[in-house]
């Protein structure tokens, strides 16, 4: 079993802890709590780079080892890092569990050392018709991020 963890912090007061767990070669389960967000849906993605030297902007595009267009987590044609949206309650907190088969913690497409990013707006899942729908889900700015590391 592999385990990863990421603690999120941002200059905008967003903070949280996200855990990644993979059983054998199976799917990865992502569980977390993030607070300090406006209520509603927020895009949630694994980005290609584990670089936060220029804040969340340094994390690069969505993790996309197969060169596909942006989509929903259940779509066959999607970036590996497309994890959809997290739902934030009226108290500004999101508590979530996501299970996904395209974000392993080991092997050539491992997400360890990459970044997880929470966006300012909802991800349209590639179906919004906006010029950014098929690249970013038109999810707006990056409000919090952190590098995914191994956990003992």
UniProtKB/Swiss-Prot annotation:
E.C. designation(s): 1.15.1.1
CDD domains on file: Cu-Zn_Superoxide_Dismutase
Cofactor binding, per record: Binds 1 copper ion per subunit. Binds 1 zinc ion per subunit.
Assembly behavior: Homodimer.
Gene: SODCC1
Subcellular localization, as worded in the UniProt entry: Cytoplasm
Protein family according to the UniProt entry: Belongs to the Cu-Zn superoxide dismutase family.
SUPFAM superfamilies: Cu,Zn superoxide dismutase-like (SSF49329)
Protein name, as recorded: Superoxide dismutase [Cu-Zn] 1
Native source organism of the sequence: Brassica juncea (Indian mustard)
Enzyme class at the top of the EC tree: oxidoreductase
């Amino acid at each position: 079993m592999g385990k990863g963890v990421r603690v999120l912090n941002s200059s905008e007061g967003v903070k949280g802890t996200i855990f990644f767990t993979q059983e054998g070669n199976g799917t990865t389960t992502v569980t977390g709590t993030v607070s300090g967000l406006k209520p509603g849906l927020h895009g949630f993605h694994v980005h290609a780079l584990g670089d936060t030297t220029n804040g969340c902007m340094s994390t690069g595009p969505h993790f996309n080892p197969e060169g596909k267009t942006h989509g929903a987590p259940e779509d066959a044609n999607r970036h590996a890092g497309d994890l959809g949206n997290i739902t934030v309650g009226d108290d500004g907190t999101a508590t979530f569990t996501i299970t996904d088969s395209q974000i392993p913690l080991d092997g050539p497409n491992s997400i360890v050392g990459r970044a997880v990013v929470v966006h300012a707006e909802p991800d349209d899942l590639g179906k919004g018709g906006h010029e950014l729908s098929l690249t970013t889900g038109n999810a707006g700015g990056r409000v919090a991020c952190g590098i995914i590391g191994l956990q003992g």
